[in-house]
Amino acid sequence: IVEEYMNEISKITGRKYGLFDYYGAEDAERVIIAMGSVTEAAREAIDYLMSKGEKVGMVAVHLYRPFSAKHFLAAVPKTVKTIAVLDRTKEPGANGEPLYLDVKDCFYGAENAPVIVGGRYGLGSKDTTPSQILAVFKNLSLPMPKNHFTIGIVDDVTFTSLPQEAEIALGGEGMFEAKFYGLGADGTVGANKNSVKIIGDNTDKHCQAYFSYDSKKSGGFTCSHLRFGDTPIRSTYLVNTPNFVACHVQAYLHMYDVTRGLRDNGSFLLNTIWEGEELAKNLPNKVKKYFAQHNITVYYINATQIAQEIGLGNRTNTILQSAFFRITGVIPVDLAVEQMKKFIVKSYGKKGEDVVNKNYAAVDRGGEYKQLTVDPAWVNLPDEPKAENNDPAFINEVVRPINAQDGDLLPVSAFKGIEDGTWHQGTAQYEKRGVAAFVPEWNAENCIQCNKCAYVCPHASIRPFVLDAEEQKGAQFETLKAVGKQFDGMTFRIQVDVLDCLGCGNCADVCPGNPKKGGKALTMKHLEGQLPQAANWEYCSKNVKSKQHLVDIKANVKNSQFATPLFEFSGACSGCGETPYVKLISQLFGDREMVANATGCSSIYSGSVPSTPYTTNEKGQGPAWANSLFEDFCEFGLGMTLADKKLRARIEAAMKNAIASDTCPAEYKEAFQEWIDGKDDADKSKAAAEKIIPMVEAAKDKCENCATIAEFKNYLVKKSQWIIGGDGASYDIGYGGLDHVIASGEDVNILVLDTEVYSNTGGQSSKATPLGAIAKFAASGKRVRKKDLGMIATTYGYVYVAQIAMGADQAQTLKAIREAEAYPGPSLVIAYAPCINHGLKAGMGKSQAEEAKAVECGYWHLWRFNPALEEEGKNPFMLDSKEPKWEEFQDYLKGEVRFASVAKQYPAEAADLFAACEEMA
């Protein structure tokens, strides 16, 4: 039946599909059996080997179940001597993988049956290239081919991998391959999608595009892989041997091997602030040597400066796309320019005529590139020596190669000891990406030591440091006399980590400066001029100890920032509205914090290999983090709390047994009773734990109760359980679980990072999306009001609820988080978080200011509901925001593309929608 319908499809489409299709030499002696997209890469390898006279072939399986032995055997050449069966799965409990076992079964008992071996490929999303297929055919030519092999990895533990063959270009005739290295949200990927459409729609060429990303949000690594050819493209893998490479971020020259695989006589385009001799001076020797060895033509352009002159901010994509068409000549330049401008209207028309005209200018200025003279003497340059460091071996041998996009080259042995998925904390600190165009410069003269800059920083890359006399001796930078009696005789400095900063500018925006001096203490400067600050950061972070023990970090905003952030350098977007809240919680409670994280933006920037932003303090204490799904993150966190309670109950039982014992020393009984009395108080349990741990460690070999307490010593200090998720998880998919957990009455803290859309998946509408806003699945503006999650939660009467916006009231944010954590029951904190999906016209460098505007105009309200006050006879509800300036409400909406687009596309309906939105606010 299936065969019959496949024949019908062939008549309609012209594409022939059989149950099993053979490709290769009629008299093939070595044959691969496979199914899926890997068969296209295999066809390229087979063509290559057949051109050299080798007798090879492949059977592509199109109908696997039910498996027809009759049709399969009919497809296999009678001349076959050895067969390799490729499976994209691993069956540890079986004698082989499914397709391999089926093929063996077909030949079981057959006379002169071929030798059959099986192998695995493509697991963990590994690319499978023709060179790997060549290794399989090479294996089949051996007198005793390796069975149960793997390709695409280096297995130096169980030794199943086949030797990797060198990558070679096997695309069709006239194939042009290109790679573009970009920065997430710089528009590179979008521009390349348009390039493929332009070439595909205006020429007879076949086109293909693959896009690879790291796990970071905007500001992360992207690589676009494009192919254009005169014949159908069968390359089902990323580009390994490009004719053209564009590097849109000059910092990548030192971070990634951007020239790897670039063909002889190829072209290279670099977006850089350097010119001529200065550029040649700053290029790594390895890169210059490659240019000379392979006769590469090198072009450069300062697209960053051009974009700023035009008014496009950091959006260099259109300029560089124009340069690509001009350099490569893939299609006539005039046609490319004409089509690019058509796509600009299509892509940006909704954002207004001004945006369209700016992008038109970007197209025209894409021709301002220059050619760099490649010195033939570069061929003899030595590689730069590797910088010495004292970092852990795990960082140098695993984390850094993965960060350099070389993770696929790591051998299996590199992952010994972390097979269960456990990952080291604090690995984000070793990235030092240096991808910001501008970073803040501290002007000590104008600093009033308020620490507001550190408070709002999304990446914890600007911090206050207080130096004692000894620490000051080694400091090679300017400091101020520290303000505050507790810092008597000490000095103060705001230090920027320029290599981890993403350059959003929120710190400079919130800086009040010194009214007497008339200027801000922070101004945004070019990264290049601030690179010497990297050494100052290194000194402060390594040699200046935390002074948080000298202040009450929960007392006010300033004090909170003397606490070391235990959430730092995450992969969040530049200007992210979410991470300042997560960072603040880690500063206040991080040494005893446990986090159950919903899947979404917060899970991606919090725990993606290899960079983990959750880290530890000087004592090795830090948050314990785990990720669950959208739909059960609250239940997951509740499970953590209940498990913690159970383990602490065992500790308490052991202590009570010891207290009742006649042989237990008095000082032990006293310490145990102190813990029992204060176990539910963070400070008291911490103080008791410091006494108890050395006591039980000393006695655990002689006392069973002490042994039990020692076994669970990490649970002596009261945990601060946080459940973190976005509005998609909290308002929508996981709402049932959230409701169940707050109804349980257990002592958990839920933080809702409310961006009012599904941020991680591209801005789809959620129940948190406000009336009138454009989002995916609400293209003409949402027609129903936002769900009032906070007020719903207050109906229980025993749930602490707060609605906060850091940029509007920093002190209220701190107070609400502090109260929520201290409340002995369920708490829900809903935090307003501007997002790139909102389309802030002022840019994400104004995300904190946007929060302030939202509250001032009445779009977002600040309030707290504390049931503990009711027990004191007080009103549990407290409205913290002032009377709104309703006259500013419509202007606020117009400042965000998600609302402004509605007015542009649906002017007649927009007025009514916005009026209703204001009324419901």
Stretches found by the model and what they are:
Residues 3-152, 160-264, 267-317, 578-584, 588-594, ...:
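Thiamine diphosphate
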Residues 336-337, 349-500, 508-722, 773, ...:
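Ferredoxin-type iron-sulfur electron-transfer modules and their immediate structural context
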Residues 66-67, 82, 86-97, 172-184, ...:
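Active-site cofactor/cluster-binding pocket
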Residues 43-45, 69-71, 94-98, 127-132, ...:
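Short acidic, glycine/serine/threonine-rich loops at helix termini
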Residues 1-26, 124-195, 200-205, 213, ...:
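Active-site phosphate/pyrophosphate-binding segments
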Residues 72-91, 211-249, 353, 363, ...:
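A structural-propensity feature for long, helix-poor, extended segments
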